[in-house]
């Protein structure tokens, strides 16, 4: 699929592999991390080998998160692939997820363009908060959505997919 539609960087949050590692195929490099004992909650980056020369990795010690750094012009780009628990998860698990993300944000140079990739299981609603969320958020804001919005405000982040209208699913 990455060849047919020319994807240079693909961040995947639904990986069912165990452990951490790297794989090489003909045209792509794969950097992955997953739990040691369960085949769930893993993530990976699939990178076209043409841009691999522009890639540096910071491999955090947590199994569910990865950070990829890419040299670019006029700015470098940092992509964080993060695991966030579902809305049914215990609060301690959600707290740990956000703490782990805070740790990754500290590793990110302030001059980099930052992209955080994940399904947040959050409904942020359509109220829109200037500089944080747009008016095209999903549904009515839930507790997880409020937590994400608060996190974005504290860290000066924007939930980009709420800034434009999505197709109905």
PLM ranges: what are they?
Residues 1-169:
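A shared catalytic/ligand-binding motif for oxyanion handling
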């Amino acid at each position: 699929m990455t060849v047919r539609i020319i994807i240079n960087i693909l961040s995947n949050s639904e990986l069912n592999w165990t452990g951490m590692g790297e794989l090489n195929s003909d045209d792509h490099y794969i950097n992955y991390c997953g739990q040691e004992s369960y085949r769930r909650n893993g993530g990976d980056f699939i990178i076209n080998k043409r841009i691999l020369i522009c890639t540096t990795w910071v491999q955090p010690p947590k199994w569910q998160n990865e950070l990829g750094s890419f040299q670019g012009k006029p700015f470098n780009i940092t992509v964080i692939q993060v695991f966030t628990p579902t809305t049914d998860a215990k609060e301690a698990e959600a707290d740990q997820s956000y703490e782990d993300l805070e740790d990754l944000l500290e590793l990110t140079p302030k001059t980099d363009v930052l992209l955080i990739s994940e399904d947040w299981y959050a409904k942020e609603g359509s109220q829109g908060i200037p500089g944080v969320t747009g008016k095209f958020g999903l549904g009515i804001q839930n507790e997880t959505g409020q937590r994400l919005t608060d996190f974005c405000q504290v860290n000066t982040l924007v939930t980009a997919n709420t800034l434009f209208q999505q197709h109905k699913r």
